Amino acid sequence: MPIRIGFGPLILFVFSCIGIYLACGRHATTRMFAKKFYLFIVLYAVWSLGLILFRGEPFHDNRQIGYTLLITIFAFAGSGMVLIRDPLRAYVLGARVGTLLAVIIAVCLSIVDGGRIGIGGNQAVFAFVAGVAAISAAIPLRNTSRYLPNGPHWLVLGFAAVLTSETRAVIVVLPIFVAVEILIFLKRFSIRQQGAAYAILFAATAALVVVGPVGSIISKRFSGMVEYYDTGRAADWEDKISADIREVMWTSASRVIAAHPFTGVGSYSKMDFVEAEAGDKATMLNGFRHVHNTILDELLNDGIVGLIFMAGAFISIFVYLWRTADSWAMRRALIYFAVICGSYGMLHNPLLHEVTIASTMFFLAALNAAASRRMMAARRAGLISYIFGKKSAA
């Protein structure tokens, strides 16, 4: 199993073990959780691991086994976190501390060493984890610590950390989240105060873009691409090779999927199939373990059936958390999380790296545990259900 020792994933694993124990023991704290989510996750695990056994794939160096087990085990972390008095508060405060550390360390490394900042050399993974941490940190808390206050500044700090990775899939969406949260945050002030704040923000943004590092990073990662599509000159796009590789991978993967739609070809040998379809361009794909697109990767691994189980799991937990959210701020966080996962998943895959899997499941587990505790509190108050804006009396 490809597990890197990390404090966050280790904590999540402990909560997952507790959650599995409580679920197997049919403990009362787990009975009101999102049952459809767990059902689809278990079905996905059985299907994915069953296909691996059916195909006779080797266990050694088979990353799909590890990733499937991680997703399945971490799915039960919410059941373990429900034992914490306020799981959401603990998670959000931890995310705020993590965001602070991420931006400080990333900026320092960028200044001292230069280049793109990543986790284990993987810049995209760092960008995704920092982005999810910033979204989590921006969730408002009641009676929050004065040293870690509520506000949109957490998204700004997260964006600063993500910029050091120069990962386009995350850079393009975080500024939208920042703008929305700043607009909502400033509504509490007078029109005059809002005008002054907007003027300061506009001036600061312009300074960072024109004379600061933001402009150079954006120019480096986006300008060449825009100029290429405007002029057609490949020389204008410095890293066009990355787009060319993805085009070959995705085109070849689509042909493989068309030939094996229901069960896929398996993670262990999928790149062999893709390279065979690539023909004389196969050398461009040397060293790649997946096709850098969540949907295509899943269709290659487990086919349409596996994709249905996976999509069913994440759609069901999203709907459950949306219905049981206690504020519109929580719902916005869910939207931001879905958008960043979608944006990242189009060019990478958050479910094919142990760190991004842990980040994804930690977010869902914390919100899931908080929702369960709200539902249990509603039951104790004589209500039969808790849905945001609708509390049904017993």
Language-model segments: residues:
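Hydrophobic transmembrane alpha-helices and their immediate junctions
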Residues: 24-26, 280, 301-342
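Transmembrane signal-anchor hairpin modules in multi-pass inner-membrane enzymes, especially those
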Residues: 1-53, 59, 82-89, 93, ...
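Alpha-helical transmembrane segments of multi-pass inner-membrane proteins
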Residues: 73-114, 119-188, 211-213, 339
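Hydrophobic transmembrane alpha-helices of multi-pass, membrane-embedded glycosylation machinery
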Residues: 13-20, 156, 171-183, 358-365
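A membrane-periplasm/extracellular boundary helix in multi-pass inner-membrane enzymes
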Residues: 164, 185-236, 251-259
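Aromatic-anchored transmembrane helix interface
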Residues: 11, 32-49, 57-81, 97-103, ...
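Long extracytoplasmic/lumenal interhelical loops at the membrane interface
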Residues: 236-251, 255-259, 263-302
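Transmembrane alpha-helices of multi-pass inner-membrane enzymes
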Residues: 17, 135, 313, 329-389, ...
